[in-house]
Amino acid sequence: MEKLTDLNYTLSVITLMNSTLHTILEDPGMAYFPYIASVLTVLFTLHKASIPTMKIALKTSKCSYKVVKYCIVTIFNTLLKLAGYKEQITTKDEIEKQMERVVKEMRRHFKMIDKLTTREIEQVGLLKRIHDKLDIRAVDEIDMTKEINQKNVRTLEEWEWGKNPYEPKEVTAAM
């Protein structure tokens, strides 16, 4: 275990890989060498990082299957990202979590739509009652002669009893 996580050992293996690659591919015009070296370095680092991580996870975890599955999925997703793919591998647990989240969001939307529909129905009922109260009915001709100021229209002779009712009267009071 110490040998797996030892930094000097890892660096010496990387140096050994690089020197081996240099000796194999001595042609200076080799254009793909940096890419091959970086991919091999990443693969080696993943190999060195994943084995101790999985061993520790299996020893400390009660649900070892889920941990191993999660580690493997994470490693494959990392490799896919390095290869340039945008897709990722998902487990059934993640799909179920996403489905639950979507269903919960849909339920919340349905409740909101139900509340809004209920409010709309109440508002329509209220508007109907207001309309019924304000309903305009056709009425025959209304006599407006008592409603207008007759002082401006009639002369003194045309008033009933010959007196203008709007003139101030003199009132005497007994003491």
Curated annotation (Swiss-Prot):
KW Transport (keyword) present: yes
Provide Cytoplasmic-side residue ranges. 52-175
Topology class, membrane = Single-pass type III membrane protein
* InterPro entries to which the protein is assigned, alphabetical: Rotavirus_NSP4
Keyword Metal-binding on entry: yes
GO molecular function, a single term: channel activity
What's this protein's family per the entry?
Belongs to the rotavirus NSP4 family.
What role does it play?
Plays an essential role in the virus replication cycle by acting as a viroporin. Creates a pore in the host endoplasmic reticulum and as a consequence releases Ca(2+) in the cytoplasm of infected cell. In turn, high levels of cytoplasmic calcium trigger membrane trafficking and transport of viral ER-associated proteins to viroplasms, sites of viral genome replication and immature particle assembly.
The name under which this protein is listed is Non-structural glycoprotein 4
Taxonomic classification: Viruses, Riboviria, Orthornavirae, Duplornaviricota, Resentoviricetes
